[in-house]
């Protein structure tokens, strides 16, 4: 600045070092060490930087898998549930588009869209959330709603959910603030009665109240490295405004609530008469769920308002369970075949056995989650003896093995051993 003053006092004309304009052609000329820059060049530089930042953020959106691409990846791991996959893909894409495509304009603020998954046990709720997190390469954690209680009571505080998310990304706060949290068994924190209770419900309505701000967006104080809270401790501050919450639950009995509402709305001369056998598919009934049904089930209106996107999953039939056994990338049959291959043996599960496994899972009402248990039980003795057995080239499983009527058939490499076993 002293040099600028000297130049002015000496009557020397000054020029911008970038555009070459004189001090009389611009509003302001800023002096640096042996250089000058005018206000017009400063404004131009700001515009270039702003456009570059917007372009890089737009490029981030381009880097996101599009909804169709997300669904295609989900199809590789989860069988069926097309409608739920579409809803989830769009919701997750819009959520991360909201984060990555932030502009400098403040005229429209995009709200967060958390997701509620409703479906029977073993229909793929958790697997959908896990696969999405893997596709997007973001921190992911699963929380069990049944262990949560209000602060000050025995059980886990809701802040523990964020602590688990931090643990999943080595306590990188910036990464955690863009993660996904899946809260399982969310139906188990429903209010114990339709009307508010005069007694304190610390594991039901109380937990719903505690989750409200966390899901909407707040700054949660989390003890570093999983320590317990005490007054002299420094806390990690985690903003949950950009964390996507996906809540899932079986909501047993919700179909009856929906059916009773539908029957009430159809009273009168214009009511359509339906037989009791009609519309017995639980998945079809759940697809018609409304906020009123969830409130009657025990969720408070404020909590439902934090979950604007609702996806329902269908009950898996026998054909879908058979496909789950053989089609996904990590299908159970492929997993067990790999285990047997590591012992130098081939595993063949016949189509009739696949059908028997699916039927047994349906009888137990465990969905896809029960398939592994059935296969494990059928192959337990074989897997126990196989590492010590010699010359076993192949193990064949048929429907009788699944029903427990016989042992898996062993095929030996040598003809003599085969005759002995026969």
From Swiss-Prot:
PROSITE patterns: CLPX_ZB. It comes from the Bacteria. It holds the Pfam family AAA_2. This is ATP-dependent Clp protease ATP-binding subunit ClpX 1. Residues 4-57 form the ClpX-type ZB domain. It comes from Methylococcus capsulatus (strain ATCC 33009 / NCIMB 11132 / Bath). ATP-dependent specificity component of the Clp protease. It directs the protease to specific substrates. Can perform chaperone functions in the absence of ClpP. Component of the ClpX-ClpP complex. Forms a hexameric ring that, in the presence of ATP, binds to fourteen ClpP subunits assembled into a disk-like structure with a central cavity, resembling the structure of eukaryotic proteasomes. InterPro entries: AAA+_ATPase (IPR003593), ATP-dep_Clp_protease_ClpX (IPR050052), ATPase_AAA_core (IPR003959), Clp_ATPase_C (IPR019489), Clp_protease_ATP-bd_su_ClpX (IPR004487), ClpX_bact (IPR046425), P-loop_NTPase (IPR027417), Znf_CppX_C4 (IPR010603). One of its GO terms (cellular component) is HslUV protease complex. The keyword Signal does not apply. Keywords: ATP-binding, Chaperone, Metal-binding, Nucleotide-binding, Zinc. Belongs to the ClpX chaperone family. Zn(2+) binds at residues 16, 19, 38, 41. GO terms for molecular function: ATP binding; ATP hydrolysis activity; ATP-dependent protein folding chaperone; protein dimerization activity; unfolded protein binding; zinc ion binding. GO terms for biological process: cell division; proteolysis involved in protein catabolic process. ATP binds at residues 120-127.
């Amino acid at each position: 600045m002293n040099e600028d003053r000297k130049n002015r006092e000496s009557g020397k004309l000054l020029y911008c070092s970038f555009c070459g304009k004189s001090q009389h052609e611009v509003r302001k000329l800023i002096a640096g060490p042996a250089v000058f820059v005018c206000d017009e060049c400063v404004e131009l530089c700001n515009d270039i930087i702003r456009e570059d930042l917007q372009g890089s953020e737009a490029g981030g959106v381009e880097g996101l898998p599009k909804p169709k691409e997300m669904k295609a990846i989900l199809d590789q791991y989860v069988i069926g549930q097309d409608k739920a996959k579409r809803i989830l893909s769009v919701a997750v894409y819009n959520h991360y588009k909201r984060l990555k495509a932030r502009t400098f304009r403040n005229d429209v603020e995009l709200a967060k869209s958390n997701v509620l998954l409703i479906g029977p046990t073993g229909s793929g709720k958790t697997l959908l959330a896990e696969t999405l997190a893997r596709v997007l390469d973001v921190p992911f954690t699963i929380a069990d709603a049944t262990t949560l209680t209000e602060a000050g009571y025995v059980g886990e505080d809701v802040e523990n959910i964020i602590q688990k998310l931090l643990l999943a990304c080595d306590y990188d706060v910036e990464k955690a603030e863009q993660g996904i949290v899946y809260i399982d068994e969310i139906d188990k924190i429903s209010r114990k009665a339709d009307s508010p209770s005069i007694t304190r419900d610390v594991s039901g309505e109380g937990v719903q109240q505690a989750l409200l701000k966390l899901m909407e967006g707040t700054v949660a104080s989390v003890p570093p490295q999983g320590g317990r809270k005490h007054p002299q401790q420094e806390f990690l501050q985690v903003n949950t405004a950009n964390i996507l919450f996906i809540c899932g639950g079986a909501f047993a009995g919700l179909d009856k609530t929906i059916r009773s509402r539908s029957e009430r709305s159809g009273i009168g001369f214009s009511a359509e008469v339906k037989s009791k056998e009609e519309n017995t598919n639980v998945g079809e009934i759940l697809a018609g769920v409304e906020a009123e049904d969830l409130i009657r089930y025990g969720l408070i209106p404020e909590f439902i308002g934090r979950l604007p996107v609702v996806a329902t999953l269908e009950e898996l039939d026998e054909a879908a369970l058979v496909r789950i056994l053989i089609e996904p990338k990590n299908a159970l049959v492929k997993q067990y075949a790999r285990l047997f291959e590591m012992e130098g043996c081939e595993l063949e599960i016949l189509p009739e056995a696949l059908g028997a496994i699916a039927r047994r899972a349906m009888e137990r009402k465990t969905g896809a989650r029960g398939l592994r248990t059935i296969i494990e039980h059928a192959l337990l003795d074989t897997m126990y003896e196989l590492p010590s057995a010699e010359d076993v080239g192949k193990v064949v499983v048929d429907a009788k093995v699944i029903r427990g009527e016989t042992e898996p058939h062993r095929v030996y490499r040598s003809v003599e051993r085969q005759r002995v076993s026969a």
